[in-house]
Each structure stands twice: as structure tokens, then as C-alpha cells.
Amino acid sequence: MPALSGPQYLGEGLKLIMRPGLRLFVLIPLSINLLVFALLIGFAMQQFSHWVDLLMPSLPDWLGFLQYIVWPLFVLLVLVIVFFTFTMVANIISAPFNGFLSEKVEVVVRGRDDFPPFSWAELLAMIPRTMGREMRKLAYFLPRALVLLVLSFVPGVNLVATPLWILFGIWMMAVQYIDYPADNHKLGWNEMLAWLRSKRWACMGFGGMTYLALLIPLVNLVMMPAAVAGATLFWVREEGEKALVR
């Protein structure tokens, strides 16, 4: 079943990034992720209670008992938003390195090197393209996230905001990471989304496992490059090259 095959890519990706030849391409984005994580968590710890109070609806006294039921939902909602912010910022900053990591993983998996050799000049040349692609992801993400954020403030409706955020987050994890190998092969944005939709259940399986792994503090720092490697395996084994427009 596709939904069951998707999660295995993350575990295999974790094994791949432990190989000596890939460690250099893991250490650089890992260091970036660590810095972003430390800064964001420090800020979030100071503001966490305020954010939960801001999102929590005001209940009349006779419904006060419901506060203890809905409070965990809003704590989870804040955690999900913090998670999204960290993932988005870290991936934007480390995008060129993630692109190179995806290239090298594909070389290992396929056993042949169809990409230019690594050089700092090549990395610098990738920055405009990868940043442009990250901005395209941001343009896809922000309007949908804004709708969910507005729903989070609507009394009653905000009770379903958390599960909607989670489902959207699972899909975005697939989009975020599988786009690295797709972009390396110059697959257009709309074509990439169409291909992912054709693999919807496998994508949700991979995205769901990635989502869960990235929610775990500190573990998520290692799992981000593992997700890049796993997404590259997904691209190769699910025959992503067939989506390329010749």
C-alpha cells in the first residue's frame, strides 16, 4: 500500500546520511538548523503562554469546565505553528545545501553521477535558483496558512483548526522535501505538484512520518537532512523522472 511504503523512506534516508561520503553535506545544514532552532525556541519559551492565551476563546462562567478540555488543543496549535515557523526558516536558509545533499544521495542510490562536481562556486551559483524555489514554496504555503490562522481565531471553528493544520503540515512536508530532487532535475513547480498528487497516499505517508519526526526537539535537527535523503529515495523509487517534460 502506498500509504505504508511512504514512511520507510525517512528511515532509509537516516541510514544514508550516516555514510562517510555524505557527512560533509549533512554537517553544514545541520549546523544551520541548530542555530535557527536555538534562537526560535528561546523566543518561543518567552512567548508561549501569551500565544496560548491569545488563541484561547473566552468562555462564560457556566462553560468554564470546558477550558480544561480545549486548552490542550490550543497548546498543540501553538506548537504546530512554532514547528511550521522553524521548518520554514531553516529550510529557506539551508536550501542550497539541501539541494547538494539531494544530488549526492541520488548519486549513491543510482550508482552514477550525472551532476556537476561539488565546488563552492557551484554552490553559490545554485543560491538564486534555490532561493527562488523556496519563495515559490512560501507563496504556496502562506495563503493557505493564513486561512488556517484566521480560522484559529474564530470561536467554535477554531476547534477544528488544529487537525486541519496537521493535515496541511503533512502535505507540506512532502512538498518541501520532495521538491529538492525535483528541482535538481528542473521539474517545474506545477508539474511537481501534479506528480505529488498522483502519488498522494505515498506522499502523505512520507509527509506524516517526517512531520512526526520533526516535532521531536533536537531529534528534528538530524531528521531534516534525513528527510532530504528520504525524499530523494522517494523520487528515485517512485520514478519521478517520468514526470519530467521532455
UniProtKB/Swiss-Prot annotation:
GO terms for biological process: cysteine biosynthetic process; sulfate assimilation. Coiled coil: none annotated. GO terms for molecular function: high-affinity sulfate:proton symporter activity. The chain crosses the membrane at residues 24-44, 69-89, 148-168, 214-234. It is a multi-pass membrane protein. GO terms for cellular component: plasma membrane. Disulfide bonds: none annotated. It is found in: Cell inner membrane. Its main location: membrane. InterPro entries: CysZ_sulfate_transptr, Sulfate_CysZ. Keywords: Amino-acid biosynthesis, Cell inner membrane, Cell membrane, Cysteine biosynthesis, Membrane, Sulfate transport, Transmembrane, Transmembrane helix, Transport. It holds the Pfam family EI24. PANTHER family: SULFATE TRANSPORTER CYSZ. High affinity, high specificity proton-dependent sulfate transporter, which mediates sulfate uptake. Provides the sulfur source for the cysteine synthesis pathway. HAMAP family: CysZ. Belongs to the CysZ family. This is Sulfate transporter CysZ. It comes from Pseudomonas paraeruginosa (strain DSM 24068 / PA7) (Pseudomonas aeruginosa (strain PA7)). The gene is cysZ.
